């Protein structure tokens, strides 16, 4: 009696079709290091998410929202550091110059603190000397996109243009390679996180921010100082706006008080230490 082998081999053309099907749902990019990055941004959700946190005043890490935090981390982003280390990562959003950045830079220099400045194309074009000073003092320059548009409202090509045109300008004018990005308005989606990561960028959100951005309605200095100090916590990524007079006037005091409380200020480049 002849035994028939029931095993069926998949023909080579079948394997090829399967591979093509997988790649059809994905996009391959070359990141800044020249490495191929495979993403499935074509099928990712584009539901717009506004970053938010639930603060406390007992110096514990705030609630970032488990779902949003997980989504951010799955796509290489960060919002808060090690809960066991009293580190603070100071960041500034600089869409335009209001006349306070020279004082901010001086306070950082006097207190030996390195910060990250997220800037737009407008800022580079109007304040090249300040950008140069930031770099010379050892601060990090982050990408806040060309035109500060909400990223989920943009298609893939528009996102690449908003991010990489600014990247190219920094390379050409300052020989500087940016690698951190903060989404304008704190708005993002699963799709935009994947697409910015594919461009070689790490998305940086925050674990503390407050209403400091309105120049015409600046917070009271005493209340602002108390709020900032009450919310200090391990691994904090602090977001301040560079157009705030209150922040500028308080910066030196905040740094000194935080150090007295046992906190150390770290650069984003030291995030994993």
Predicted feature locations:
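Metal-dependent polysaccharide deacetylase catalytic core of the NodB/CE4 family, i.e.
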Residues: 85-88, 98-100, 109-239
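Catalytic grooves of carbohydrate-active enzymes
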Residues: 233-269
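Hydrophobic alpha-helical segments, especially transmembrane helices
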Residues: 8-10, 183, 242
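N-terminal pre-catalytic segment of deacetylase/amide-hydrolase enzymes
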Residues: 2-91, 97-105, 110, 126, ...
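Non-transmembrane alpha-helical segments in soluble domains
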Residues: 105, 167, 229, 252-255
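Short acidic donor-binding/metal-coordinating loop in glycosyltransferase active sites
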Residues: 92-94, 242-243
């Amino acid at each position: 009696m002849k035994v028939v082998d029931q095993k069926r081999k998949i023909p080579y053309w079948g394997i090829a079709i399967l591979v093509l099907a997988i790649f059809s749902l994905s996009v391959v990019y070359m990141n800044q290091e020249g490495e191929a990055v495979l993403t499935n941004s074509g099928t990712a959700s584009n539901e717009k998410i506004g970053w938010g946190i639930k603060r406390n005043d007992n110096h514990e890490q705030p609630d970032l929202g488990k779902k949003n935090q997980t989504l951010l981390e799955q796509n290489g982003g960060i919002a808060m550091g090690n809960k066991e280390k009293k580190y603070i990562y100071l960041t500034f959003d600089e869409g335009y110059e209001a006349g306070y950045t020279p004082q901010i830079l001086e306070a950082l220099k006097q207190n030996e603190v390195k910060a990250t400045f997220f800037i737009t194309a407008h800022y580079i074009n109007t304040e090249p000397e300040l950008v140069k000073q930031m770099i010379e003092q050892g601060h990090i320059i982050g990408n806040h996109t060309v035109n500060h548009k909400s990223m989920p409202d943009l298609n893939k090509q528009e996102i690449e243009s908003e991010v990489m045109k600014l990247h190219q300008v920094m390379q050409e004018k300052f020989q500087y390679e940016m690698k951190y990005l903060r989404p304008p308005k704190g708005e993002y989606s699963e799709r935009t996180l994947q697409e910015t990561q594919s461009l070689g960028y790490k998305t940086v959100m925050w674990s503390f921010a407050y209403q400091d951005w309105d120049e015409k309605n600046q917070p009271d200095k005493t209340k602002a100082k108390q709020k900032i100090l009450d919310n200090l916590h391990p691994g904090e990524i602090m977001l301040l706006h560079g157009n705030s007079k209150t922040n500028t006037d308080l910066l030196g005091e905040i740094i000194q008080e935080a150090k007295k409380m046992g906190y150390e200020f770290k650069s984003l480049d030291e995030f994993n230490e």
